[in-house]
A protein has these predicted regions:
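Conserved beta-strand segments of alpha/beta enzyme cores
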Residues: 2-4, 47, 74, 108, ...
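Conserved beta-strand hairpin/beta-sheet module of binuclear metal-dependent hydrolase folds
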Residues: 1-44, 137-147
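Metallo-beta-lactamase
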Residues: 90-93, 115, 122-213
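Active-site HxH/HxHxD metal-binding segment of metal-dependent hydrolases
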Residues: 32-117, 199-207
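Active-site neighborhood of phospho(di)ester-bond hydrolases with catalytic His/Asp-centered motifs
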Residues: 27-28, 49-56, 75-78, 127-130, ...
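Short, glycine/acidic-enriched loop or turn micro-motifs at the edges of active sites
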Residues: 23, 32, 58, 81, ...
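Short Gly/Pro-enriched turn/cap motifs at secondary-structure boundaries
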Residues: 6-7, 105-107, 127-129
Length: 213
C-alpha cells in the first residue's frame, strides 16, 4: 500500500491517494482541483477505482463529481451524510460563495463495520459521529484516515449541520481506547500518531467526558 498526499482547495484539505500493489487507487476526500488529482494518478500510473469520503462537507467532496464523471470511480459515503451531496447549506459550501459546488451521487452508502476492498487493501469503516452524523474513519493496515474527526492536537468542530457535541465525546472515547501504533492521516494539518495524540491532544490525553465537562 502506497499513500500520496495532496493538500487542496480553499481550506487546505488533505486528499489521500491510496495505491494497491496492482496499481489500482482509492482517493480519500477529493476536496477540489480534480485535474491535480488526475495528474497525480497519471504520474503514479494508477487507475482510480473508488472515492472514499470521510464525511459530506464540501471541502472534502468538491472534486467528486468531476472525478466520477471522468473515471467511473464508485463513490462511498456514510448513509447519514447522503443528504449533503446536493445541499449547499448542509454541506456548508454556502460559506464560500466563490466556490462552484457540483452535486454528485453516492454509489455505496456506508455503515459501521463495512469492509471496502481494493485488491490486497482492506478499509474498515468506523462511524465516528460528532463533526457530522455520518463522519467515518477508514482503517487500513496501521493507518487511520480520520477526516475531521481528529487532528494533530485538536478535533473537528460540531456547530455545523448534524454536528453533535455529545456524540463527539463518545467517538473520541472510542479512539482513545485504540492501540497507540496507528498513524493518523487527518483531513487538515500534518499526520500524527495515536500515541502522540493520547499524550498531547487535550481531547484524548484526559478522560474525554471530564475534558468536555
Amino acid at each position: 500500500m502506497e499513500i500520496r498526499t495532496l493538500t487542496l482547495g480553499e481550506l487546505d484539505t488533505n486528499c489521500y491517494i491510496v495505491i494497491s500493489a496492482a496499481g489500482n487507487a482509492a482517493v480519500i476526500d477529493p476536496a477540489d482541483e480534480a485535474q491535480k488529482i488526475l495528474d497525480t494518478l497519471k504520474t503514479e500510473n494508477a487507475e482510480l477505482k473508488m472515492i472514499l469520503l470521510t464525511h459530506g462537507h464540501f471541502d472534502h467532496t468538491g472534486a467528486v463529481a468531476q472525478l466520477k464523471e471522468e473515471t467511473g470511480a464508485k463513490v462511498y459515503l456514510h448513509e447519514k451524510d447522503e443528504c449533503m451531496t446536493d445541499d449547499t447549506i448542509k454541506n456548508v459550501a454556502y460559506l464560500c460563495p466563490g466556490f462552484e459546488y457540483k452535486p454528485y451521487t453516492a454509489d455505496k452508502l456506508l455503515s459501521e463495520g463495512d469492509i471496502i476492498r481494493l485488491d490486497e487493501i482492506e478499509f474498515s469503516v468506523i462511524n465516528t459521529p460528532g463533526h457530522t452524523a455520518g463522519s467515518v474513519m477508514f482503517f487500513a493496515e496501521n493507518c487511520i484516515f480520520a477526516g475531521d474527526t481528529i487532528f494533530e492536537g485538536s478535533v473537528g468542530r460540531t456547530d455545523f449541520y448534524s454536528g453533535d457535541y455529545t456524540a463527539q465525546k463518545k467517538s473520541l472515547a472510542r479512539i482513545a481506547a485504540l492501540r497507540e501504533d496507528y498513524i493518523i492521516y487527518p483531513g487538515h494539518g500534518i499526520s500524527t500518531t495515536l500515541y502522540q495524540e493520547k499524550k498531547f491532544n487535550p481531547y484524548l490525553s484526559v478522560d474525554p467526558i471530564s475534558f468536555f465537562g
